[in-house]
Amino acid sequence: MKLESAIQNELDFITNTIKANTEPESIYLFGSYANGAPNTDSDIDIYVVVPDSENDTIELCAKINFDLAKRRTLPIDLLIGKKSIFENRKNRLTLEKIIANEGIKIYG
């Protein structure tokens, strides 16, 4: 799927910011931007899969959001999940299943 250059630039910034804070297994874009139906109220929905060895995903999410706030131009909804949890939940009726099936893997 081809995204607008402004959105692609934002995704590049998001990906680089995440990679500066952790070593993600993968990063997914999901929601309205992934579905090709964003509107003026849409945020950028991002799900980051991190290694199981990542100790504190809540603190990591706060740190990444802080770093993203320095330059982002659109609102971002950032979720972080450990790899084993993502792998386990992507086969059930969960958000992870929607992300795995309908999201766009932008890294990993």
Q: Which residues fall in each region the model found?
A:
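Short beta-strand->loop micro-motif that forms the acidic, two-metal-ion catalytic signature
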Residues: 45-49
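Catalytic core of pol beta-like nucleotidyltransferases
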Residues: 1-26, 35-40, 51-108
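Glycine-rich beta-strand-to-loop/alpha-helix junction loops that act as flexible
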Residues: 30-32
